[in-house]
């Protein structure tokens, strides 16, 4: 009975903190974007907006449904976590190499030569973010949205302030690129700081196949 009550309280707390994170994060991002819009050109947002499409598609493949499989599966093991961790990193590296290789073609397609360098830099987000996917999944499994909220808000606020300073100093589109990278880096650092988890030196094909069939 006590366990049931404790779980309910934890679930309610998780829902509340999840709502706090959502609305607070939107408020922070909205405020920062309003100010940055007055400092940057529409073309700066346009370039980053085009690249966001490629990053989102890549991110979907990197995750591959394994995060949801971990969260939904009851009898998950440390081998499962480690397998997903290594899969995410390797897949992220593969997609980054693809973006790096085809960056000149994408830039040529949009008739924007400067996109080549921007793609190769902002694409690092894929690798950085892949390092903390499992950490976030573990916190979700623990229904610990309080820590997730603190991590997300802190990262968004700090990276946003840095982006604003860069925009004010005249760095243009690089303000948005650096803001994105710093946000991803801070998220990863904070996830590692709050959750002291390390993967095993093991990748299991059996675990991979089970999670793949579970998540598909």
What are these regions (language model features)?
Residues 1-7, 11, 146, 189-216:
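Interhelical loop/hinge segments that connect adjacent transmembrane helices in multipass membrane
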Residues 17, 51, 83-87, 121-124, ...:
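Hydrophobic core positions of alpha-helical segments in small-molecule transporters
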Residues 57-61, 97, 101, 112-135, ...:
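Alpha-helical transmembrane segments of multi-pass membrane proteins
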């Amino acid at each position: 009975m006590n366990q049931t009550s404790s779980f309910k309280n934890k679930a309610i707390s998780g829902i509340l903190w999840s709502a706090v994170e959502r609305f607070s994060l939107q408020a922070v991002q909205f405020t920062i974007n309003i100010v940055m819009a007055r400092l940057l050109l529409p073309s700066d947002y346009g370039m980053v907006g085009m690249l966001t499409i490629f990053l989102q598609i890549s991110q979907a493949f990197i995750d591959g449904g394994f995060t949801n499989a971990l969260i939904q599966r009851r009898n998950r093991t440390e081998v499962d976590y480690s397998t997903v961790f290594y899969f995410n990193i390797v897949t992220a590296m593969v997609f980054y190499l693809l973006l790096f290789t085809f960056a000149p073609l994408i830039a040529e397609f949009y008739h924007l030569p400067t996109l080549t360098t921007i793609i190769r830099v902002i694409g690092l987000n894929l690798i950085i973010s892949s390092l903390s996917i499992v950490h976030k999944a573990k916190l979700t499994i623990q229904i610990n949205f309080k820590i997730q909220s603190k991590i997300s808000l802190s990262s968004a606020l700090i990276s946003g302030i840095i982006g604003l300073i860069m925009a004010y100093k005249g760095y243009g589109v690089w303000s948005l690129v650096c803001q994105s990278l710093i946000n991803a880096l801070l998220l990863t650092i904070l996830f590692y700081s709050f959750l002291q988890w390390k993967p095993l030196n093991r990748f299991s094909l059996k675990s991979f196949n089970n999670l793949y069939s579970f998540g598909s």
